[in-house]
Amino acid sequence: MMQDGMWHVETFESKVEPGVLEAFFKDELLPYWRSRGFNVKVFVTQYSLGPAQFWLLTEIENMASFDSWPELAEGEPRGRDLMNRVVRMMENVRGSVVRDLETTGHGR
């Protein structure tokens, strides 16, 4: 875990049949991203009103970390293909950066 406890969080819903997006993340996208240096996790609601909601969390060192993301995530043909595929399966995407309140130096 990085010292600052910062995470980029995206929440979204699936546009595809139940289980398809989950399998894509587990079998293809998460292993690829991790091989490229990302510390990334995906959570999905188990019980909720309405469609299942996904939470994609990616640990970041600082705000400048975003500068290297395009090359890490899409710098290879396989990465571009995976990103194009996942974007087509997602809807209602929202993103933010959060920080662990228990780390030193938290705040705005």
Which residues does each predicted region cover?
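Short hydrophobic/aromatic beta-strand micro-patches
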Residues: E13, L57-E59
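Glycine-rich beta-strand-turn "strand-cap" elements at beta-sheet edges
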Residues: M1-W7, F38-W55, G79-R108
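Short, surface-exposed ligand-recognition loops at beta-strand->loop->(often short) alpha-helix junctions
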Residues: E13-F24
